[in-house]
Structure formats: C-alpha cells, structure tokens
Amino acid sequence: MVDVLAHESELLGLVKEYLDFAEFEDTLKTFLKECKIKGKPLSKSTCGSLRDPKSLKFQRDLLAAFDSGDQKVFFRLWEEHIPRPIRDGDSLAQKLEFYLHIHFAIYLLKHSAGRPDKEDLDERISYFKTFLETKGAALSQTTEFLPFYALPFVPNPMAHPSFKELFQDSWTSELKLKLEKFLALMFKASNTPKLLTLYKENGQSNKDVLQQLHQQLVEAERRSMTYLKRYNRIQADYHNLIGVTAELVDSLEATVSGKMITPEYLQSVCVRLFSNQMRQSLAHSVDFTRPGTASTMLRASLAPVKLKDVPLLPSLDYEKLKKDLILGSDRLKAFLLQALRWRLTTSHPGEQRETVLQAYISNDLLDCHSHSQRSVLQLLQSKSEVVRQYTARLINAFASLAEGRRYLAQSTKVLRMLEERLKEEDKDVITRENVLGALQKFSLRRPLQTAMIQDGLIFWLIDILKEPDCLSDYTLEYSVALLMNLCLRSAGKNMCAKVAGLVLKVLSDLLGHENHEIQPYVNGALYSILSIPSIREEARAMGMEDILRCFIKEGNAEMIRQIEFIIKQLNAEELLDGVLESDDDEDEDDEEDHDTMEADLDKDELIQPQLGELSGEKLLTTEYLGIMTNTGKARRRGTAGVQWGGPEPLRRPVTPGGHRTGYPA
C-alpha cells in the first residue's frame, strides 16, 4: 500500500493520459471529478513525455551541431535520443544517416575560407570510411548510394563531376529540411500514451528473452553438429595418415638391403605408429625385419575399432513426408529438406548412415522413379529460392555417397534437371555450388560422364572458367575437377578439340591461379587433352612449353614432376604408353567406393526456427514418426587401392573432397 501511495500521482496521471488518448470523454470527466472529490493529485509530467523541454532542447542542439559541422556532438546526440530499432531497422533513418555522414565528411571542404586543416579533414574522412565499412555497408548494393563509396578515395571531390551536387548550398538545405521532417515525424509518432508504451515494452521484453534463449539453443545444436563432423573428419585424416605411412614403410623396407637404415630403426618407427595399447606387445612379439610384416600390420590396423554401439535413428513415415514436401508451404518444405539432409550429414559413418540412406532409397524419397507430374525432384525448380537451394543441398548430400550416386544415376531426368538448374541459376550462389557439386560427383560414373559430354557441359565449364576470380573457391574447384573428369574420356577430348585454343588458354591461365587446390585437376586436364594431335599442335603454336616451364621455376616438387610429364606429352610425336587405352565401354570402373560428406553441405543456413517451430530431427520424429522398418545394412565394397601417388597428373576421375583426404577414385 505504501508503494501505491508513493507513486499514486504518477499512476493517476498515466490513467488520465490514456483515457484522453482513447477519447473516453465521459469516463475521463467522471475520473477527474472523483479524483478532485477525493483530493487525489494528478501528475502532469506523464503527458506529452516527448514534447517536454528536454526533447525540444535535444532537437535544437542536434540542428545546431548540424549547422556548425560538429559531427562528434551530432552523432552522440543522435545515438542517445534516436532509438536503436529505428536507427537500424527504419530505411528512412538509415538513408538519412548515410547522407548526414557525407555532410560532415565534406563540411570542411565546403566551409573553410582557405585550405582546410589537413589533420581535421583526414579525421573526418577516416570516420566516414569506418562508417562505410561497418553500418554503411548495408547500403553498398543500393544504386543510389554506390558512387559515394568512392568518395573517401577521390583526391579532390569538389572537382569530381559525380560529387558536384554535394557542394551546392541547395543540397545542404534540402538535407537539413529532411532532418527536421524526420525529427517532427518521429516525435509526433512518439506521443503514444506512456501506459501503452509500458505495456508493449514489457511484453516485447519477455518475447525478446524467449527468442534469444531459443536462438541460443539452435546455435548450440548447430555447434554440436559441427563438432561431430569435425570429429569424423579427424578420424578420416587419421586413417589416411596410416595408409600413407604404410607406403612409406614399404619404401623403408626396400632400403634395408642397401644398409641405408638399420632394422632396429625401422622397428622403432613401426612401433611408434601403432596405438599405445599395442606398442609394448608388438615390440616383443612381431619381427618387423621380415619383409612385408610392418606394412601388413599397419594396413590391418585400419580395421575399425569397435566403439560403443550407435543406435539406429527412428523410422519415418515417408508417405506423409513426401506429401508435405509436394503440397506443404514453402517454409515447411525448406525445414523438411533441411532435416532430411541433416540426417545424412550428421549421422555416424557406418551402419547408422547406411541405414538412413537405404531408407531414403527404398522409399524413393526424391521420386527418381516417379512418373507423376508433381514430384519431390521438381522442388529444384521451385519459385522459392530457399526451397531450390535446400533441394540442391539434399541432392548433393545424396551424391556424396556411393550408394546415393547409384540411386540418382538410375534416372536420366535427375541429371537433366541438374544441368538445367546449373545453367539457369543466377540468383543464389550456394544453390549453384550444390548443383555443381552433385554433377561433379556424378562424373565419377562413366554413363553419366557420357551424358554430360553429349549435353555440351564442357563448353559451359570453359565459359565460366574464363573469369575464375568471379567464382567462389567451391565453384572454381569443383568446375575444374568436373572438367578434368570429362576430359579423361575420348569424347571429352574430342569436344575440347573443337575449341582447342580457348581450352588451352583457360587451362594455362588457371595454372597460375592463387587457389592451389585446383592445380592437380588443371594438370590432369592438360595432360589428357594433349593426347589429341590437333590440340598438341595448337599448344605448340601458342608456346605452351614456355608457359609450363615458367611454372616449373616456382612450383613445389610434386607439381614440377607433373608439369614435366605434361611437357613430355606435349612434345610426343606418338602417344605415350597407356594413353591409347579404350574408354568406350560404359562399365563402372571409374566409380569410387568411398563416401565424402563435405562440411560445405551445411554452411550458411538460410532459415532458423522461430519460437515454437520444430526443425531438424525433432521435426521428423515429432510429426513424421513411422513404424520400425529400418532396412538392413547396405552392401559395402572394399576400399580400393591407392591409384595416384603424385608424380604423374591425375588419370582417373576424382572428386575434390575425396582427393584431399587421400581416397582414390
């Protein structure tokens, strides 16, 4: 009761202000009469809270700082009195603030009688630069403001025709008028009764807290997925290291007979390569000096260690899933496509992931075998940018797995739709990256290589590779790798022969590109197409050997050896051994057995769930839980032997993810 009495006058003033605002005239008269009878004083300070002398003083001070060019005072007042939601979210406020920064940046140039103080001018220009690089960056794609991003770098902006208008008195007057109108509009809009403001702010505050907590939960789940994938990648790197070490040990064994190293040293190296638990027993029980023993033991150590059992993921109602993927809202489709992709990308390699993939395939999740006019695959042509992107991501995830590629390759319509999307997608970089990634992985299969060559994909690749600096690293790497895979085929080489000069120029330019990840694919493509006499002749005419020798001077040892092979191919009058082998049959010899689930599949997610929305595995198991129908383990082929050791250019199809981790194709 004491608290009520202490604030009674202010509370009654709030009620009066609201009744007046809502035009409860009779109620207000009765209320005022009763307050007077009871002797209750009304606070007068609540009414017109933003029309008080303080707000008027702020406006006067702000306009005075504008006139005097005092940018520090101006922007301090601006940030103190203009609410952040308006500064950051209102387009009118953002544009006005941009022009205000220009006003203060050029103030000394306009108002100095003589030469402006250089230190003060440099400080203002630096302040404007900082604004452009931070808050002002949001308007960098707007045509209206684009020329002003060059302003800090023009030596004499007063003489530059693009900025002539800025130095006219009318420009400053118009800007000041806009500022005055903005302040008048803002303070007029702020005459909302304080009671209503308090109510709205309290509700919004609670909502903001809940939204923030929900966002933190989503981020925590995302980090968890990232760490899981990082663990899987480290495990793959470890296996790769052991495989490489086995080759090293074979080389060391070959030198033992030459007494270059001692058997004791070889044994100590081998023991160190094994896990801690095995070192002591192996050191005494295995004779590593017997040829073949060490490398055999190392390869045997690659057998997967039995970890704790990983449970299979719950089965899903695929009929309901596919129905909602076709008929649901675009937002629901996007969340479902995301959740289905995450099932693949975050599942444990082995039985859990194989079971997920087999369930997708056996239920024809993508409708590869459907002849219906409406299918899941057609989401690749959706009007929604998010749905198109998330469909492309899911297809790329399928293509990252050998069984997934086999499933997608059964229908030529998948390839045709991807090719069409690749050539048409110009709005979304990530959609095109994922479509390109899927096609590149398709090129590991010979029938799909043939189809892509016949469809003229080589010409499209050459065209975009003419300007490699305009491409993302992913697009560049996968484009060059796809081009190389297609150039390994006779039909692909003959396609290149039709535009030999252009192909050779593009590849020679790429040799010097700063992205060194593409070098093996550029070398492989060059080596392959130079087996065609007409291309060799064109290469000699353009001085290709001199170009290649320039890169020998600055390349690493591995690249130097590859370029030497290319030069040898260039100067050959007859084809080198092995180049004439036939590649006309459509067998699957080029298909690789390993699975490469790259981290890029889940980068830069476009959608985040709002408060109360389900996403990911929670969405699938809450709304689409099915009966337990998990299929058995997929048939797995053994890991292929290493096909490429470095000295020669690549001569078998690869995919960038698999090539980097050391897996062969």
UniProtKB/Swiss-Prot annotation:
It comes from the Eukaryota. Residues 204-235 form a coiled coil. InterPro entries: ARM-like, ARM-type_fold, ARMC9, ARMC9_ARM_dom, ARMC9_CTLH-like_dom, ARMC9_LisH, LisH. Pfam families: ARMC9_ARM, ARMC9_LisH, CTLH_Armc9. The modification Phosphoserine is found at residue 582. The keyword Phosphoprotein applies. Keywords: Cell projection, Cilium biogenesis/degradation, Coiled coil, Cytoplasm, Cytoskeleton, Phosphoprotein. It is found in: Cytoplasm, Cytoskeleton, Cilium basal body; Cell projection, Cilium; Cytoplasm, Cytoskeleton, Microtubule organizing center, Centrosome, Centriole. Residues 582-604, 636-665 are annotated as: Disordered. GO terms for cellular component: centriole; ciliary basal body; ciliary tip; cilium; cytoplasm. Disulfide bonds: none annotated. GO terms for biological process: cilium assembly; positive regulation of smoothened signaling pathway. Residues 582-603 have a biased composition (Acidic residues). Residues 7-39 form the LisH domain. The keyword Cytoplasm applies. Involved in ciliogenesis. It is required for appropriate acetylation and polyglutamylation of ciliary microtubules, and regulation of cilium length. Acts as a positive regulator of hedgehog (Hh)signaling. May participate in the trafficking and/or retention of GLI2 and GLI3 proteins at the ciliary tip. PANTHER family: LISH DOMAIN-CONTAINING PROTEIN ARMC9. This is LisH domain-containing protein ARMC9. It comes from Bos taurus (Bovine). The gene is ARMC9.
